[in-house]
Every structure is written in C-alpha cells, then in structure tokens.
UniProtKB/Swiss-Prot annotation:
The keyword Nucleotide-binding applies. Catalyzes the ADP transfer from ATP to D-glycero-beta-D-manno-heptose 1-phosphate, yielding ADP-D-glycero-beta-D-manno-heptose. It comes from Campylobacter jejuni subsp. jejuni serotype O:2 (strain ATCC 700819 / NCTC 11168). GO terms for cellular component: cytosol. Homodimer. Residues 334-461 are annotated as: Cytidylyltransferase. One of its GO terms (biological process) is ADP-L-glycero-beta-D-manno-heptose biosynthetic process. PANTHER family: BIFUNCTIONAL PROTEIN HLDE. Pfam families: CTP_transf_like (PF01467), PfkB (PF00294). The gene is hldE. Its EC number is 2.7.1.167, 2.7.7.70. ATP binds at residues 191-194. This is Bifunctional protein HldE. Pathway: Nucleotide-sugar biosynthesis; ADP-L-glycero-beta-D-manno-heptose biosynthesis; ADP-L-glycero-beta-D-manno-heptose from D-glycero-beta-D-manno-heptose 7-phosphate: step 1/4; Nucleotide-sugar biosynthesis; ADP-L-glycero-beta-D-manno-heptose biosynthesis; ADP-L-glycero-beta-D-manno-heptose from D-glycero-beta-D-manno-heptose 7-phosphate: step 3/4; Bacterial outer membrane biogenesis; LOS core biosynthesis. The lineage of its organism: Bacteria, Pseudomonadati, Campylobacterota, Epsilonproteobacteria, Campylobacterales.
C-alpha cells in the first residue's frame, strides 16, 4: 500500500485556520536578580507552518497537490502564509493572523505567547464563493478547525453540502463542544477530550467508547466516526467498533500529531483506500511526528523507515523487559511458543493477540527447551534466528527467550495482564492462568503447523 500511495498525487483542498508557529530557542541557565524567574537568552528563531498550514505541509510532504483557502490579516504572519502556501487567501484588514510563539529551552517548551483574533470572519460569503469556484477539481476536502473564526457554521454547512453533491469526501478536524456545524461530513477526528465534551459523557472507557463513537456517527450523520485515543491508537466506527493500535516507540512532543492523522486519512480517502487501513497508516504517521520536536510534517519515506525499526532491539532479557514495562502503564499481552518455522498461522495468531492490548510480548523457548520438548532434530532454526523473525513483525513488541519447559517462571516474573493461548487449550490447564487477569484462547488457522511443513519437506526429498 505504501508503494502505491507514494506514487499518487491527489488534489486536496484545505480550508481552515492557517497559523504561524514560531519557536524561540533559548539558553536558560541563570535566575533573574529582579524576580524568581529564569533568564532566557535567545539563540535562534524558527518560523513554521501551524494549524491548517501544518496539515497543508503534511499533505504536501506525502506528495499531494494541495491548495489552501483561507482568511488572514494584513500583517507579517499573513504575508508569511501567502508566500509559503499554494492557494488563495482573502485579506481581512485589521485582523490578526494567529501567531504562536513557543519559548524553548533544552528541548522543552517553557512558555507560549499567542497573538490572534478569534472572532468570526467578516468574509464568509466571499470564502464560500471562492470554494464553489474551486471545488470541482479536487478529490478530498479538509476542514481544519482551530476555533480562530474562519470555519463558521455558515462556511462549514456550505462546504459540506456542496462537496456531498459532488461526491467528494470532507474530513474535519473539529474544535469546541458543538459539532452540529459539521453535520453531514464524511468523518470527524476529535481526540478523546473533544469527543467527551461533544457527547457530554463522563468517560469513554469500556462500553462507553462504542456507545459514544456510534452516537457521534448517528447524531452528526457521518459516514465514519473516528476518535483519536492518544497512546491507545485510533477508534473507528463504520459498521462496528475497531481499534487501530498506536505505534509510537518514543514520545517527545505531541504538537501536530492530530494534523498528521487527518492529512494521512485525507490522502488515503482521496485514493479510495479502505478506512481501517487508512487509520492504521495514520497511526504510523503520528508515531513519526511525536518522536520529533515541534510542528513537523511526515512523508511516506519516513513512515517506511519507521516500519523498518531495528528489530533486534526488540529482543530483551526478562530483567530488561521488566524495567521497560514499569515505565509505562500499558495493557500487557503475553503468549509463548517454539515458533520454529514461522508460518501464516503464526502470523494471524500473533496479529490477533496484539489487538487484545497495548504491548505484545512473545516468550520464546530456547534451543535447549525446544530440543527437550520436540526431540533431538529440533529446532530447525536457532533461538536467535527465531527471535529475529518474530521481532521483525510490527505487531510483536518484544521477544524474550526462556530456558524452562514452560513459561510459568517468566509469567510470574513479568506479570502480564492477558495470557493468550491457542484454542486447543480449551479443555487443558493453561500454565500461568492463576497469575494473569484473564486468559484469551485464539483459534489457529487450519492446515498450518511447523510439523506439517517439516513432513512436507521430507516427502519431497
């Protein structure tokens, strides 16, 4: 899919609150004698595209042919946006173009200074007329709302209705607690906080998530309902609830993660990619973005590199693993096996196991353990080779090798939340079941086993 998408250049129109993100990098090593505050010595300034302009930058970085429509003030920030974006901007005299100045010290944001005018624009009719003139040439429309006054109810209604007549998808990154102005859009991408405010729910845990995301779809006549869940991934409701798990390995700055998500979703829908696959790809894009500092764009090459993470680093000792698990409050899924010759059945089984939680750990029998269990002719592949093959799958987070005949000692040491075994354990004692919160039995794909593969090879000789 990535190879296909990286060759596409869909025309995408973006309307919304275009902003300037400024980063003032400082050295803060002294305390002021005037007051108990830090002295910030300016080292450099970095002006970047922000808000809807960052969505534009993400789409352009992905390879889209992007066109911006918006309203800016007659100021330096407005000029900066016009000079750096392809599109058409209406100039509202006296209006302040949103400008956010982040004061950075030692890679940490210590203060943000905002200049903006959040009143509704005076040029609604002109913006709608401009949209009507341009829309027929595009494959998707993005409404990027930061509640700075451009996306008024009148503008949103006109855009969504016109696009719907032309069968052009409209994707909305919403703001505020009233989503009525987005009714009829293809999808919205609220985060958990925004969704809670719109739904007036106390939480989105357990059954509430499915109830809430379904309610958004029905209440606002959406084609798809999406809620971004930060480190838990992306929730999608089409005909039912699905969760695309998050992919981030390290998080430095969440600025712009939502922009990358809607950019990837728009790019995918413009190319008629299935929606759940689009959500999975959006997660990978967000993982790239949060590993950097500031509002940054993401490319398909970066997503490819992210997917090719050094898999040997995923092979850990149980002691290393325990330290890592203590640092994060994640739902841990554990399964184990010999995985001597990895086959299609293993892949389907492990993929299903991963979907049960946040982190999937595979306990792998050592060579000595396999030999005791399977006989002198096994294993076919060494423990290191087997561990590397398992670690190469994106849905496997960690592999840990154990020498015992059963994983009981390892399970007791790591104390995972969920223990996964094959459905053939239905009437058997599951080792470690008394240690974990729950046991899940997963059906194997019929006709696939390492023993059958070995016999097949022998028969051909």
């Amino acid at each position: 899919m990535l190879e296909f998408l990286s060759q596409q250049k869909p025309k995408i129109l973006i309307i919304g609150d275009f902003m300037v993100d400024n980063y003032t990098w400082c050295d803060c090593s002294r305390i002021s004698p005037e007051a108990p505050v830090l002295i910030a010595k300016t080292l450099k300034e970095d002006k970047r595209l922000g808000g809807a302009a960052n969505v534009y930058a993400n789409l352009k970085s992905l390879g889209a042919d992007v066109f911006a429509l918006g309203v800016v003030g007659d100021d330096e920030s407005g000029k900066f946006l016009q000079e750096n974006l392809k599109g058409e901007f209406l100039i509202q005299k006296g209006r302040k173009t949103p400008f956010k100045n982040r004061i950075m010290a030692h890679n940490q944001q210590v203060l943000r200074l905002d200049e903006e005018d959040i009143s509704e624009i005076l040029l609604e009719n002109e913006l709608i007329a401009l949209f009507d003139e341009k829309i027929k040439d595009f494959k998707a429309v993005v409404l990027s709302d930061y509640a700075k006054g451009v996306l008024t109810p009148k503008v949103c209604k006109a855009v969504i209705e016109k696009a719907k007549v032309l069968n052009i998808p409209v994707l909305v990154d919403p703001k505020g607690s009233d989503f009525n102005k987005y009714s009829g859009a293809t999808l919205l991408t609220p985060n958990k906080k925004e969704a809670l405010e719109a739904l007036k729910f106390e939480n989105l845990e357990g059954e509430n998530l499915e109830k809430g995301i379904k309610k958004l779809k029905e209440d606002f006549s959406l084609r798809y309902s999406i809620i971004t869940l930060s480190e838990a991934g992306i929730a999608l409701f089409d005909e039912g609830l699905k969760i695309a798990p998050a992919k981030a390995l390290e998080v430095y700055d969440v600025t712009g993660a939502g922009d990358s998500v809607i950019a990837v979703l728009a790019f995918c829908l413009a190319n008629e990619i299935e929606i759940f696959k689009a959500c999975e790809l959006a997660n990978e894009a967000a993982a790239v973005v949060v590993s950097k500092i500031g509002s940054v764009s993401v490319s398909f090459d970066e997503i490819k590199s992210f997917k090719r993470v050094d898999f040997e680093k995923k092979i850990k000792s149980k002691e290393e693993l325990l330290v890592l698990l203590k640092q994060n409050n994640k739902k841990i899924v554990f399964t184990n096996g010999c995985f001597d010759i990895v086959h299609f059945g293993h892949i389907k089984y492990l993929d299903k196991a991963k979907r049960l939680g946040d982190v999937l750990i595979v306990g792998l029998n050592s060579d000595a353990s396999v030999k005791r269990l399977k006989g002198e002719s096994r294993p076919v592949n060494s423990e290191f080779q087997r561990a590397c093959m398992l670690a190469a799958f994106y849905f496997v987070d960690f592999v840990v090798i154990f020498d015992e005949d059963t994983p009981l000692e390892l399970i007791s040491f790591l104390k995972p939340d969920i223990l996964v075994k094959g459905a053939d354990y239905k009437d058997k004692l599951v080792v470690g079941a008394d240690i974990v919160s729950r046991v899940e039995l997963i059906d194997f794909e019929e006709g696939f086993s390492t023993s059958k593969i070995i016999e097949k090879i022998k028969d051909k000789k």
